Amino acid sequence: RLLYVALCLALIFLHLLPLETLPRGWAGPDVMLALTFAWLLRRPDYVPPLLIAAVFLLADLLFQRPPGLWAAIVLLGNQALRAREPGLRDLTFAVEWLSVATTLFVMMLGYRVILALMMVDQAPLGLSLMQVIATLLVYPLVAIVSKAVFGVRKIAPGDIDALGSRT
């Protein structure tokens, strides 16, 4: 859990660094969200809901987004994936990726609808779609790095979770 928080804080820090002085014409991936999804679908006990909410609320505050809105939507998306995780455990990576893609698109649409209802200025739809697609393209890489570097693999029957109980 501490590693997840450290990685998220490092990603937030890298996002806040002023590496470019001109605004970009494209939207990069949300690596923190891809990391959260990858770890959630492999070891849900490593990313409890309150930890996800706290990390994304901090990101909302630091990135000057509407406080708590994206954090709440991420939490809802994570809970939807958490409910499907036992069924996805034995299926292929393509099914997992499709499930993540569906969740990401629904989250993005929900975020945009709520911002529109509240009459808040938002990024063009093209940039939002570009970010979702970029996040989906980086997701396999995040999943591979999570397994190869950090040892976060899918739960097998009989594994012991972080709380000491068998799965």
Features from the language model and the residues they span:
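Terminal, non-globular segments
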Residues: 1-167
